[in-house]
């Protein structure tokens, strides 16, 4: 069980003695029980337990940050922090717009503020939580940006903030739980509206999993909406305001390539009479940004169903925004029929893709490929077309 942190323990974690101990055991192959015995023996039970928690978080942080092994987090802070490539992409927007100073109104572990500072921007960063600011301050030191970044423990909605462009990433977690209702985020939508008011520019970072229409109801209307995906997963929805907006209504961006698609929302692609020779699975950034129809129009593709994101056509196409799959067989989502298809194509393993189907990929695999019929690997698409559930065996075209 994770140690409940207090300010005293947080300050102990960033002390030289504890840092040296953590470094000492960084490369150890000792089992966790032996490591925590050493930690508690050297620093006491509470601090030792907190060190063990931090050690585990740092292992995960390496997936997000180049020097994550040296940084400081709580679990909620790490989970909300942007991956470094995403934060760098966002920071470049501020640079390109000509901003040399930014206010970060809810800085968390400091990752966004640090990335802005690394881009040469002066930053004043605020957070209401003292433990958070202890860690953010130390992270700024670890990353070597203290000349450009100042951390303040204060409620950004209660103090008079400096003028200039503002960065906002409202807290969407309480303890280990994600807060689904945006009205419960901190700062609240109303408070964020007040913080954005009269500023030359603002960047509001939001969850891509939240309904976009709900966000538009609650937050000030943005000048641009961008959805950013990283390595195939939608990571952020960003509302851009003022001089940070690029002049388009919607944008989908794929990282690390940096490829971008922009346009007006929700232009609807026509629906196909039947599924063609190829299925195209749009990148989630394209789906969340409402730009699937625009992409379909440009490439002469059609929806397989107006409420399902898959597109179809008869020509093989290459696009960073679309996975191209060659259709091998189609039938109703009946285990008996699908297993015949699996046997006929000598399928040994499948990757599941699904839309409009509630079953998990694991459950679908067990139901439709209960045993190996050969040594071939294909993609199996479970989806809905009108009122029917169908299964499509397909080959991913790399």
PLM features per residue range, with description:
Residues 1-398:
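SAM-dependent transferase fold signal centered on methyltransferase-like domains
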């Amino acid at each position: 069980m994770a140690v409940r942190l207090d300010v005293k323990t947080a300050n102990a974690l960033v002390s030289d003695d504890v840092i040296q101990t953590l470094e000492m055991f960084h490369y150890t192959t000792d089992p966790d029980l032996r490591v925590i015995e050493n930690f508690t023996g050297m620093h006491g039970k509470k601090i030792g337990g907190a060190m063990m928690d931090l050690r585990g978080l740092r292992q995960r942080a390496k997936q997000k940050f180049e020097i994550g092994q040296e940084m400081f987090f709580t679990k909620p802070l790490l989970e909300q922090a942007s991956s470094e490539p995403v934060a760098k992409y966002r920071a470049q927007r501020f640079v390109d717009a000509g901003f040399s100073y930014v206010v970060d109104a809810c800085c968390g572990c400091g990752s966004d503020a640090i990335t802005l500072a690394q881009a040469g921007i002066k930053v004043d960063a605020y957070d209401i939580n003292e433990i958070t600011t202890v860690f953010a301050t130390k992270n700024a030191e670890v990353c070597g940006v203290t000349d450009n970044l100042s951390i303040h423990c204060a409620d950004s909605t209660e103090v008079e903030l400096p003028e200039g462009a503002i960065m906002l990433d409202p807290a969407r977690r309480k303890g280990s739980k994600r807060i689904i209702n945006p009205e419960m985020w901190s700062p609240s939508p109303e408070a964020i509206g007040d913080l954005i008011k009269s500023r030359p520019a603002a960047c509001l970072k939001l969850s891509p999993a939240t309904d976009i229409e709900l966000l538009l109801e609650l937050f000030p209307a943005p000048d641009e909406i961008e959805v950013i995906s990283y390595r195939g997963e939608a990571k952020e929805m960003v509302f851009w305001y003022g001089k940070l907006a690029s002049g388009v209504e919607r944008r989908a961006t794929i990282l690390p390539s940096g490829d971008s698609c922009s346009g007006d929302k929700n232009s609807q692609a026509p629906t196909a009479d039947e599924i063609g020779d190829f299925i195209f699975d749009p990148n989630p950034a394209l789906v969340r940004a409402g730009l699937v129809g625009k992409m379909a129009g440009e490439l002469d593709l059609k929806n397989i169903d107006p409420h399902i994101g898959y597109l179809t056509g008869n020509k093989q196409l290459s696009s960073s925004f679309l996975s191209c799959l060659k259709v091998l067989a189609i039938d109703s989502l009946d285990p008996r029929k699908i297993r015949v298809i699996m046997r006929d194509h000598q399928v040994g393993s499948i990757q599941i893709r699904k839309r409009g189907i509630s079953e998990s990929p694991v459950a679908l695999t067990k139901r439709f490929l209960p045993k190996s019929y050969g040594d071939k690997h294909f993609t199996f698409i479970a989806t809905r077309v009108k009122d029917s559930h169908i299964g499509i065996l397909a080959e991913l075209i790399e």
